């Protein structure tokens, strides 16, 4: 009913100046506070009489109004609503005051925290500064101590130097005095001896004359006595013919014995070496000697009891080459049986194609011994290379069973004599080889293997009756080689049943896998394929489980192919370089010939 008393509806109550936000609404009042509030309420709520008159008039009009009760109820409800709004406004103001107080507290705490931080920072800075000052003082003290120590050491060194100098001066003075005294002593002794010699000169001369006279008489008597004895002995010797003959015979026998011992020892040693030992150039041989029997008795017995076997056993070659090599083996065996002349053979082709293996098998099949030489061993011998070659062929000529002399890598010393840079020793060794192989022999057969036969001297090529080329294995040969080595190095150890054998074979078709690998390894030699299978075995041993899987085979095969490609690239570069050098040498030779 604010409209009855002239109070505006939207008027906001004023907050007293001395209102405290933290005081409770019904809290106790301070002394004198009630009187001030009473005086202020009279001033704040005083109204004039016109308002009452209007209210009375409005009440009378309202009583006359037919809807007076509803209007009164509406007014009461509006008054209640207004009171609620005033209460809400009051609560908002109280909340704002509380927020202001909390903000004031927060700001105060923030300021206090900042103050503490600044104080801490200042204290830290002060502590650091004090620490720096302390360190500086400590460093200065250490530096001062170091300077004092250096000064003390310097003074001590100077003192020691002075003492050492004084000691040296004292010693030098003592030595000088001692030397002076010794000189004076020697001078005095010399003068005394000289004076004594002058005083005793006549006596000394008389003694010397007597001594020399006695020596002269003694020497003359010795000469006379020796001459008489020698003369009487010669007279007796010359008058006795028996003694003369005995002396001449003794001297002759002594000379003959000395010469025989000197020359006979060397001849006997060479004979024993040629019969019992083997030449130094022979790297490997199946020929049994007494020395070999003493060194390796078991191996010697096995070699003596060995039987003939197929020369192509374990050697995988193309069919045409197998037929030709089998004919050579049969021819060699029949030649030995009929005591005919052996034919010299040259095997040429890429390395690792079975040349050395077939040469050894050929010797075992034909009943001959074999001796393996290496061409690279001759060049380091220098001037001794010629005698070493003669020893080899002399040793081969004395073989009772017959001997196959196999020279591997023969192009190392059988090169063309017109080649630039060939040493005189190598040329002499080549001439000795040509001399010993000029005619065919019934005692030995010469087999030479080379990777570069085009480097041979023409005279060397004329010594060979047959030239056999060993080519790289084809598809079928690679399959046979892989299966053979796989069975030897992997299948047999894996199925041996030995507890100490770690190798195991995974469940896969290894025959098909070998055929697949054979298709990928085109251009590889038999030795490379053997190393490939051995690499599979090594990888299986290196694995955690010791099982050879298909993945291990594929991985090692890929690595081997990459390595083979690198080798082929290196070989092509080397061949190109060699051809360029030959062309350059030929051009230079033509120019020199033209000049």
From Swiss-Prot:
Residues the entry annotates as binding ATP: 349-356
Family matches, as SUPFAM superfamilies: P-loop containing nucleoside triphosphate hydrolases
Gene3D superfamilies, per database record: P-loop containing nucleotide triphosphate hydrolases (3.40.50.300)
Disordered: annotated span: 1-48
Protein name listed in UniProt: ATPase family AAA domain-containing protein 3
Positions in the Mitochondrial intermembrane compartment: 1-243
Locations listed in the record: Mitochondrion inner membrane; Mitochondrion matrix, Mitochondrion nucleoid
Recorded family membership: Belongs to the AAA ATPase family.
Motif stretch (PDZ-binding): 592-595
Biased composition (Low complexity): 20-35
GO cellular component terms, A-Z: mitochondrial inner membrane; mitochondrial nucleoid; mitochondrion
Coiled-coil regions listed: 80-107, 140-175
Gene that encodes the chain: atad-3
Residue intervals on the Mitochondrial matrix side: 261-595
GO MF annotation list: ATP binding; ATP hydrolysis activity
Phenotype reported upon loss of the gene: RNAi-mediated knockdown results in an increased adult lifespan. RNAi-mediated knockdown at the L1 stage of larval development results in arrest in the majority of animals at this larval stage. Some surviving animals arrest during the subsequent larval stages. RNAi-mediated knockdown in young adults results in a gradual decrease in the reproduction rate over time whereby initially fewer embryos are produced as compared to wild-type animals, and eventually adults fail to reproduce. The few embryos that are produced by the young adults are viable, but animals arrest at the L1 larval stage.
Lineage of producing organism: Eukaryota, Metazoa, Ecdysozoa, Nematoda, Chromadorea
InterPro entries membership: AAA+_ATPase, ATAD3_N, ATPase_AAA_core, P-loop_NTPase
Record function comment: Essential for mitochondrial network organization, mitochondrial metabolism and cell growth at organism and cellular level. Important during development for the up-regulation of mitochondrial activity during the transition to higher larval stages. Regulates mitochondrial iron homeostasis. May play an important role in mitochondrial protein synthesis. May also participate in mitochondrial DNA replication. May bind to mitochondrial DNA D-loops and contribute to nucleoid stability. Plays a role in regulating the production of reactive oxygen species in response to heat stress.
Keywords tagged on the record: ATP-binding, Coiled coil, Membrane, Mitochondrion, Mitochondrion inner membrane, Mitochondrion nucleoid, Nucleotide-binding, Transmembrane, Transmembrane helix
BP GO terms, sorted: mitochondrion organization
């Amino acid at each position: 009913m604010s409209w009855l008393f002239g109070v505006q509806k939207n008027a906001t109550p004023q907050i007293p100046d001395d209102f405290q936000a933290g005081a409770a609404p019904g809290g106790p009042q301070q002394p004198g506070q009630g009187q001030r509030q009473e005086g202020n309420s009279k001033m704040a709520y005083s109204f004039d009489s016109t308002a009452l008159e209007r209210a009375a008039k409005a009440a009378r009009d309202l009583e006359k109004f037919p809807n007076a009760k509803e209007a009164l109820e509406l007014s009461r409800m509006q008054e209640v609503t207004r009171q609620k709004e005033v209460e809400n406004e009051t609560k908002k103001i109280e909340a704002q005051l509380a927020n202001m107080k909390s903000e004031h507290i927060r700001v105060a705490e923030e300021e206090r925290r900042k103050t503490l931080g600044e104080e801490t920072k200042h204290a830290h800075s002060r502590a650091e500064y004090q620490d720096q000052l302390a360190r500086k003082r400590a460093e200065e003290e250490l530096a001062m101590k170091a300077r004092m120590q250096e000064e003390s050491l310097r003074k001590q060194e100077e003192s020691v130097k002075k003492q050492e100098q004084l000691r040296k001066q004292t010693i030098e003075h003592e030595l000088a005095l001692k030397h002076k005294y010794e000189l004076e002593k020697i001078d005095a002794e010399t003068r005394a001896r000289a004076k004594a010699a002058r005083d005793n000169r006549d006596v000394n001369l008389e003694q010397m004359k007597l001594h020399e006279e006695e020596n002269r008489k003694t020497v003359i008597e010795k000469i006379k006595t020796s001459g008489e004895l020698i003369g009487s002995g010669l007279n007796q010797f010359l008058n006795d013919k028996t003694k003369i003959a005995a002396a001449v015979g003794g001297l002759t026998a002594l000379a003959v014995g000395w010469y025989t011992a000197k020359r006979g020892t060397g001849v006997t040693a060479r004979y024993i070496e040629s019969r019992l030992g083997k030449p130094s150039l022979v790297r490997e041989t199946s020929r049994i000697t007494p020395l070999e029997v003493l060194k390796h008795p078991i191996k010697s017995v096995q070699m003596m009891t060995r039987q003939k076997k197929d020369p192509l056993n374990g050697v995988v070659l193309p069919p045409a080459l197998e037929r030709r090599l089998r004919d050579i083996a049969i021819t060699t065996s029949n030649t030995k049986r009929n005591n005919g002349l052996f034919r010299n053979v040259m095997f040429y082709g890429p390395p690792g194609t079975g040349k050395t293996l077939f040469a050894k098998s050929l010797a075992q099949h034909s009943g001959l011994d074999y001796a393996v030489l290496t061409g690279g061993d001759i060049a380091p011998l220098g001037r001794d290379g010629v005698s070493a070659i003669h020893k080899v062929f002399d040793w081969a000529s004395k073989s009772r069973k017959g001997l196959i002399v196999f020279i591997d890598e023969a192009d190392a010393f059988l090169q063309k004599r017109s080649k630039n840079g060939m040493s005189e020793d190598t040329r002499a060794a080549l001439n000795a080889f040509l001399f010993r192989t000029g005619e065919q022999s019934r005692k030995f057969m010469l087999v030479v293997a080379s990777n570069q036969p085009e480097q041979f001297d023409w005279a060397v090529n004329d010594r060979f009756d047959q030239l056999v080329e060993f080519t790289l294995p084809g598809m079928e040969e690679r399959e046979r080689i892989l299966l053979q080595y796989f069975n030897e190095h992997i299948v047999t150890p894996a199925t041996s049943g030995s507890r100490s054998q770690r190798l195991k074979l995974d469940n896969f078709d290894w025959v098909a896998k070998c055929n697949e690998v054979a298709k990928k390894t085109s251009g590889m030699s038999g030795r490379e394929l053997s190393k490939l299978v051995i690499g599979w075995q090594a990888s299986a041993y290196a694995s955690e489980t010791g099982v050879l899987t298909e993945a291990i085979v594929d991985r090692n095969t890929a690595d081997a192919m990459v390595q083979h490609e690198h080798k082929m690239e290196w070989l092509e570069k080397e061949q190109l370089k060699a051809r360029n050098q030959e062309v350059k040498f030929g051009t230079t030779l033509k120019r020199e010939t033209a000049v």
